[in-house]
Amino acid sequence: VSQLLYGDCFKIIGKKKEWYHISTLLDDYTGWIDHKQAQQITKEEAEDIGVQSTAYTTQLIDYIETQNNQLTTLVIGSNISGASLLNQSYSGPTISGKSKKEKLLETASLYLYAPYLWGGKTPMGIDCSGLTQMIYRINGYQIPRDASQQAELGNTLSFIDESEPGDLAFFDNDEGKIIHVGLLLENNYILHAHGKVRIDRIDQTGIYNLDTQQHSHTLRIIKKII
């Protein structure tokens, strides 16, 4: 389960009545969408605006305007590089290219206290891997959608003391399956989506929930992606 944001590109791999079966261009995630929520463009256009020339919005909530002065709501991380193809215009702030690692923390702070939503990728609702994916994507680094996929990237760190802010910590269940991810902050704190986007402590055991005063997740691995 996931969400598409404004400007996300995908290819149609099947159709059933009014539904499109799609695969997203950036992370090969598959699912179904209503055909009314899509605008068809060429493969070359999709490759350009969806991968090569992305420009992401940086405001939590913003608007894009049509030629008829109608406003469409945008959330942070919307890719407006293809707005002209839809005869729409946007004049707000955007970010393009790869940012420095410390910029990840600035972006992460914008999602703080967003409610948890399985499959969500916006400040109105987001899950743990959607949070880390969007933080990295907005700053120019594409990582997969799911926590287990993200854990396959980067270099493995043996101890928290070897990490730096912006690295990712992954957590598993009793069967050893990775089920959770969070963004490491300074001084052994971690930002993650659990009920809401929150900041808790982290140690070699896992995440220590500051509200319940007990560990909520078991640490499996720490990865340095950039």
Each PLM stretch: what is its role?
Residues S2, Y6, K16, T24-A114:
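Boundary regions of SH3-family modules and the immediately adjacent low-complexity/disordered segments
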Residues D8, S78, G166-D167, N188:
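Structural motif
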Residues I22-S23, H180-L185:
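Short beta-strand-centered aromatic/proline hotspots
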Residues Q40, L157, L185-I226:
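Aromatic- and glycine-rich peptidoglycan recognition patches
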Residues Y116-P165:
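Catalytic cysteine-centered active-site loop
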Residues K121, D172-H180, A193-I199:
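Active-site loop architecture of trypsin-fold serine endopeptidases
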Residues E162-D174:
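Hydrophobic/aromatic-rich core segments of domains that either
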